[in-house]
Amino acid sequence: MLKKRLIGVVTVKNGWAVQSFGYRRYLPLGRPEVLVQNLDRWGADEILIQCIDRSSFGLGPDLEVLGKISKLGIATPLIYAGGIGGREDAVKVVSHGADRIMVDAMVWDSPQSLETVARDLGTQAVIAHLPLRMGEDGLKALDYRDRVEQPLGSWLERLPLEWVSELMVTDWSHEGSPGSFDERLLTVVQLLDKPILCFGGISEAAQLHRVLTHPTVVAAGVGNFLSYQEHAVQTLKKLLGSSAMRAPHYESTL
């Protein structure tokens, strides 16, 4: 049986790691490479670097941040998101040390580019990001750049699912609020035939366990809450105590 994964999420704005609250408020945490090094040391199964200010200003990927991280020599697989507009950006990101990429704005602007990217990098290297909220009349997908929501169907019509390996569903309105991930968002799996990653407001072992026991959910991301205490990754994994979760890793001091 494939083990479920715990993804450590590092949010970057203006080159600095930040705590993000509902895509509206941000508090500084420090240098991204320091957080990444900690997550690698504590045994995260993957690390996601999401640079949230790149696509909004047409800046392209943050290769400077990626370059600093690549020099760390970490063993944990790295996912990068932010400013990827097409094949050229995607190739640069991978050449600067990312193992996989996650795209968001590209789905809205040029979904046809996904095929080109996937043919170059391989479908397994491509993740699509879906910021969701449960509205009064159903699931709403958010274009975070202008904060405009569309019915989920509009987003799905744009996305060529055959060119992505996984989808990350983010509860953007509850991001940064402890234990607040809206599990109703998982109804999206009824419309999709893809493995799901979950993120946004996931902080407690009990909810993490519920989310990960969903058969289509293969991983969950935790962001702000891993910065509050040392060895937070090992603590969460130990509390879960599930054979379905990869075992906690403790770095040797010898």
Residue ranges and their predicted role:
Residues P28-L29, G60-G67, R145-G153, G179-T187, ...:
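Charged helix-capping and loop-helix junction motifs
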Residues E46-V65, A105, M168-G179:
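Glycine-rich, proline-tolerant flexible connector loops at the mouths of alpha/beta enzymes
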Residues V12-R25, A98-E175:
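Conserved anion-binding
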Residues S113-L121, L208-S252:
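C-terminal helical cap(s) of enzyme catalytic domains, especially alpha/beta-barrels
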Residues L27-D40, G86-K92, D146-R158, A205-L208:
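Short, acidic/polar
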Residues T11, L39, I47, V93, ...:
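Conserved, mostly hydrophobic/aromatic
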Residues K71-I101, E183-A220:
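Catalytic cores of alpha/beta
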Residues R5-V9, E46-L48, P77-A81, D99-M102, ...:
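Structural preference for beta-strand elements that scaffold enzyme active sites
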